[in-house]
From Swiss-Prot:
Residues 21-118 form a propeptide. Secreted subtilisin-like serine protease with keratinolytic activity that contributes to pathogenicity. This is Subtilisin-like protease CPC735_023170. Pfam families: Inhibitor_I9, Peptidase_S8. Keywords: Glycoprotein, Hydrolase, Protease, Secreted, Serine protease, Signal, Virulence, Zymogen. The active site is at 161 (charge relay system), 192 (charge relay system), 351 (charge relay system). It is found in: Secreted. CDD domains: Peptidases_S8_PCSK9_ProteinaseK_like. Its main location: secreted. Residues 1-20 form the signal peptide. Belongs to the peptidase S8 family. PANTHER family: CEREVISIN-RELATED, PEPTIDASE S8. One of its GO terms (biological process) is proteolysis.
Length: 406
């Protein structure tokens, strides 16, 4: 293994100075009026799905004629098929949704609700993320990131977020368009997605410096419907399995909200299809089991740490508990940003911790034979530094490490 050394040079950030990291107020479920996610029972075949959707259209048409349906409830909008998970979402009037709920092929009907990106606050501190995960101990005299020369080459990280500033020089042309679920420019006008993408795989700030970064634009702002996130995951799984990339890909989701079982089931199906899914634990300072997709047992749920005062400590905002499999740096992280070809920003949150781990998985996939999510998870946790983090509150006391030997 040939180790490379990278010393981060800090550039001017575009964000104001903050000195504290308050816990985000835990979000209550924010239901989107008249929008629902309908999950089919396991084992349903395609013919039955097509028959059901035709039936839904007929029910909707009948209720439109009766005056029950309005412009706000146009009917079926999006279909999902991830491995053995089949579902759809749409806007339905009360009469139509009650008929759907009673259909023998329907497992569950859930209101569609909001999920949010999980950055917390911006702060002008020196970035330390890649440096920390290439050292067993907190580096005091070594400001370098040590990494294998393969550096994620041939691997893919799918960033499900607000889009990516793909023209940024630090991506070196490796950030490519995947899918845009909105009728807007395929770019990032929010900044969160570009920042996460840079942590995973940019030249200066990234963990997997040679990986391909795939832009899966699910939100245009800091929040959106679960059904949009499910649509992005549906596309990602189909793309990964269609290109036979299961052993060379990770999906990174730095989005969180109150528990949504359909979203958790979609993650479960993605992993069963052979796709590794990494998610942020959330910034509520509470048990991650109360959030999705962090509560999905099949996901690799990531908490945030800081390394102030000479010790690694769980960030006060970071969700915790048995759902959290591993931690990574998440405070004062400098990375790529929106707006120009060289924009940077300094941000904090479990949103920043998760792409460290997604990038690390892509990095490890380029070095080791990791054919499926179980193997990727096993290698990640096998390498992780144990029992160094203060105040884990029931989370796994594991800190991401790239195996550099430093």
């Amino acid at each position: 293994m040939r180790l490379f050394q990278s010393t981060c040079v800090l550039v001017g950030t575009v964000l104001p100075l903050f000195t504290a990291f308050p816990i985000s107020s835990p979000r209550e479920i924010e239901i989107i009026p008249d929008k629902y996610i309908i999950t089919f029972k396991k084992g349903i075949d395609q013919a039955a799905i097509e028959a059901h959707t035709a039936w839904v259209s007929s029910v909707q048409a009948r209720n439109t004629a009766r005056g029950f349906t309005t412009a706000e409830t146009p009917g079926l909008e999006r279909m999902f098929s991830i491995h053995n998970f089949n579902a759809y979402s749409g806007s339905f009037d009360r009469e139509t949704i009650e008929e759907i709920r009673s259909h023998p092929n329907v497992e569950s009907v859930e209101p569609d609700s909001m999920a949010y990106v999980t950055e917390l606050i911006e702060q002008r501190n020196a970035t330390y993320g890649p440096r920390r995960i290439s050292h067993r101990e907190i580096p005091t005299g070594d400001n370098s990131y040590w990494y294998d020369s393969k550096a994620g080459e041939g691997s893919f990280v799918y960033i499900m977020d607000t889009g990516i500033n793909k023209a940024h020089v630090d991506f070196e042309g490796r950030a490519i368009p995947g899918v845009n679920l909105h009728d807007v420019a395929f770019d990032d006008t929010h900044g969160h997605g570009s920042h996460c993408a840079g942590i995973a795989g940019s030249k200066t700030y990234g963990v997997a410096k040679k990986a391909t970064i795939v832009d899966v634009k699910v939100f245009t702002r800091g929040g959106g419907a679960w059904s949009l996130l499910m649509g992005g995951l549906d596309w990602s799984v189909k793309n990964i399995t269609g290109e036979d990339r299961q052993a060379k890909s990770a999906v990174s989701i730095s989005i969180s909200g109150p528990t949504n079982q359909a979203m958790n089931n979609a993650v479960k199906a993605a992993v069963e299809a052979g796709v590794t899914v990494v998610v942020a634990s959330g910034n509520d300072g509470r048990d991650a089991g109360r959030n999705s997709p962090g509560s999905a047992p099949e996901s690799i749920t990531v908490g945030s740490i800081n390394s102030r005062r000479g010790m690694d400590t769980r960030s006060s905002f970071s969700n915790y508990g048995s759902s959290v499999a591993i931690h990574a740096p998440g405070e004062g992280i400098i990375s790529t940003y929106k707006g120009s070809r060289d924009a940077t920003a300094n941000m904090s949150g479990t949103s920043m911790a998760a792409p460290h781990v997604a990038g690390l998985i892509a990095y490890l996939q380029s070095i080791h034979d990791l054919p499926d999510p179980a193997a990727a998870r096993r290698k990640l946790l096998e390498l992780a530094t144990s029992d160094k983090i203060q105040d884990v509150r029931g989370s796994a006391n594991k800190l991401a490490y790239n195996g550099s030997g430093k």
